[in-house]
Amino acid sequence: MTPAERKRLEANIYDPNFKLHYQYREYHFHSSDLKCARPDSAGPSLLSSIRSSYHTVGLVLSLFMNVGLSSRQTREVLKGLFGIRLSHQTVLNYVKASAAIIAPWLDRNLPKPGHRAAADETYITVEDEQHYTWFVIDELTRAICGYNLSNTRGAVPALATIYNAYGPPESNLHRRFILAKDGLGSYNNAIMAYNQHSDRNIIFGKTVVGLSNHDDVSEKYRSLKQLIERLNRTYKFHTRPRAGFKSMSGAIDLTVLFVAYYNFLRTHSSLHSVPIPIPELHNIESFPKQWEILIRKAAA
């Protein structure tokens, strides 16, 4: 160190140009740590025990998801409009069975994000405690590419969601992605862990903070943040009638059906079509019939 440098250091001992110790992080995650929350695998056996027709199941899902009614409201509408008598527990059983069947098929058919995507988490209430639902949405297709639920906002559920959306890093070594996010530190840790075994970064995190643009990054990627905030509001529309969930499994079931509905059944206003068209659903306008076809396709 030269005399001039020593004098600068004495004048400001916190000068980063003379920092002698640096923090280094290395992440060690097992694949079992990165599993996203999903329903149990009892769906086919549950659905085989359903005494009603698939059309009735489609009606239940149409009221429960498309319209956003609670299980008790769904029961009352089925009785008052269609003369179908089901208990609210039967409604929940149909929802649970359908979610368990659709979930594996949904994971196989989630699209990989394009060059630009956004990630965010939103809170839900489970057993009177705060939990979190995580989403990754693609800018171009407007499709949900990854989702997860957890009881914390830590790095592990954030990384699991990124793995669910992008797949393992080895499959993306020659690709580069931009992921817009908020200022939650878990995203930085998750992105660093995802990139750590690659010679070059695969995912570049872009932090968009606040409601107004106070920096160039926020201004450039504000549209991505707004995209996922709109997704969160749509999700909240479906969770609000429940006034919280009595169990984590109930929250998982609804979220699985929501992602399936959002990607494959719900027309997006800016696209004038669903984010991911399914040939079998072409020109099928009946909501119950759409759900019936989707369940049969997932169970095949």
Regions found by a protein language model. Give the residues of each.
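Basic, short loop/linker segments at the boundary and entry of helix-turn-helix/winged-helix-like folds
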Residues: 1-65, 83-87, 112
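Helix-centered, glycine/charged polyanion-binding patches within enzymatic domains
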Residues: 11, 23, 183-184, 188-245
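DNA-recognition alpha helix
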Residues: 71-84
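Short, basic alpha-helical nucleic acid-contact segments in DNA-binding proteins
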Residues: 85, 93-112
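Active-site beta-loop-alpha junctions of metal-dependent nucleic acid enzymes
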Residues: 96-97, 147-172
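Two-metal-ion RNase H-like nuclease active-site motif
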Residues: 112-126, 135-137, 181
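C-terminal domain-tail junction helix/linker
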Residues: 241-300
